[in-house]
């Protein structure tokens, strides 16, 4: 390699300050011929710029390593080990390359396959991120299993949780509107001096917040104030739907210098003038197994108010606050100024006065007095004493509302002139196509009447088509059916084929007014039994089998046309009941038994999946805390893990059979037995009567007192009980004279070939104990055996191969 001139070296050093990594490496190589070029394994060439600077500034090249970034120690060790031996010269900076930067990561992933970064990331993710500082802006989305999804695609989390349905949900892409949700799930008491025609024609039209006098909420539990954590006193609700005590929210708003403040819960803007009176009523929360009572509801097509059939009236005008029978079925309740003063203002005034008397000497009393002053101003405005001050905002709001709702108001004005034709054509397209196959009907009748009367000329074709439609709806787990779909069963009930031609929907709803409706399987059973829902009982009571919750959307409204009066985002549930023969006959239940059993299997499968999912989540959470599941080793194999009870029972059965065949009786004196049979006999378990009469028997006492004895206990117990065994043997003979074959615990006799399953108390230690006791019995029973025959006893002694007893000194 030729040597370069000093001028060339100076030129190269000047170029190093402005050039990239390639020129710096070339200049360093040309100025120092002893040093080979940097290897590619040490890192990218684009990071060698600080090394050339260190070469030119010889005074600071020793302190350049202090500027190295704070990386994990293991990663620095890996980087240092990969350096080549040629880099150990003094002219090179020992600072490791920055592997966390963008250029180095691209280089390593492109030239080295990304394996080194993967190893480093795996080692860093294996430990807690608090142990390493690491480079900034690390993407940890892979740890959360989180990926961004394009806005145009539908997720699987919308609606009721069904993925296939969520893709078809068109409304689910709209952003969540708190005010829309509040107005869809609450009831409003509004002033009667406004026009609400649009709201009674379109369920999704929002009510002007300035017209609201009181909000009524039906919940399963009484709400509490988030500030004082007590049931709210003179409760006020914000536009975002959160409830506070009046004094608490005034105290919170006074802490801000602005005229508004953020909501303590959702951080929405809260203005003092937007606070409305609220009343929360607690309703029963039904669960599976409860008995629920549902009543038959009736709703005209095109009308947004559904009333019980027993309390039916023609809803020509909105329902007022004083109508107690129908007030719970309407979203809007019109109230006069006198009713607002009596039902709203006076109640809040009494509550504030009680609170002031209790907290008169507390710092909160000033805010209670401020609430009372605002309540007096409202009372004056309602009573007409301050019309010039109080009515101007209301008039302005009314004008704005009318300007915004002018197009919808025009449609609502022309809608009654067209009857119900235009409203129903959007929801009943399928039914009209089926009806168009029949003979023509008079033009004077509206389209709805054609749907009601078409079942008379063609009951068969329509019933088959509607049954298929109902089956599809049932398989999807959606909704129930209405009048026109419930009149397809006149074949089985010819006496009720002539039905009313009124364009109405009939459905079952909870008696207390909750949005709980009957499942289509139960509806078909009632239609089969009574001919139609119109002829069904007004009230039914049954046990809840399943409750499915939904939220109203455009797709749900298309499927359940009878629920089109519910606004969007309104929460409702569909209940499946267990109908019994007093309500429906056994023949009807047999007809729909397949559908009922199918749904039962689906519920069981869903419950199993939920349990598995809960166990899996619990195991994952325990693993995060260092708790791992225990290892379960099965010990059910009797060949590898023999049980002592099974062996003794089999030997006892063999002994009983041979003794019965030879001598004709099971009980004999121990003197007439052979030594081997006597030892086997003493180890057999006692009968139930014998075990109760003699609890001091050796085997029984061992199983009860010490299920897992030690080796020393085996020897000690065996020696202590050895002298007692011959005395207890006659008791067994006396007790076993009655039954010829004792019955085992599982209900089978000992003479059967089947070996009973050993109990959980048996263990391997008991089998070892029995073996040692069997070896000790011939030695302890020498006096008895010598009376029978001394020669035979001597031969028995010679068979003893091993003994652990230290007492055998005779």
UniProtKB/Swiss-Prot annotation:
The keyword Zinc applies. Its main location: cytoplasm. Residues 1-31, 104-113, 662-674 have a biased composition (Low complexity). GO terms for cellular component: cytoplasm; nucleus. Its EC number is 2.3.2.27. Residues 607-623, 722-735 have a biased composition (Basic and acidic residues). One of its GO terms (molecular function) is zinc ion binding. It catalyses: S-ubiquitinyl-[E2 ubiquitin-conjugating enzyme]-L-cysteine + [acceptor protein]-L-lysine = [E2 ubiquitin-conjugating enzyme]-L-cysteine + N(6)-ubiquitinyl-[acceptor protein]-L-lysine. Pfam families: zf-C3HC4 (PF00097). Residues 76-92, 652-661, 801-810 have a biased composition (Polar residues). It is found in: Cytoplasm; Nucleus. Keywords: Cytoplasm, Metal-binding, Nucleus, Phosphoprotein, Transferase, Ubl conjugation pathway, Zinc, Zinc-finger. The keyword Magnesium does not apply. Pathway: Protein modification; protein ubiquitination. InterPro entries: MAG2/RNF10, Znf_C3HC4_RING-type, Znf_RING, Znf_RING/FYVE/PHD, Znf_RING_CS. The modification Phosphoserine is found at residues 5, 110, 128. A zinc finger (RING-type) spans 225-267. GO terms for biological process: positive regulation of myelination; positive regulation of transcription by RNA polymerase II; protein monoubiquitination; ribosome-associated ubiquitin-dependent protein catabolic process. Residues 101-185 are annotated as: Interaction with MEOX2. Interacts with MEOX2. PANTHER family: E3 UBIQUITIN-PROTEIN LIGASE RNF10, RING FINGER 10 FAMILY MEMBER. Belongs to the RNF10 family. This is E3 ubiquitin-protein ligase RNF10. It comes from Bos taurus (Bovine). The gene is RNF10.
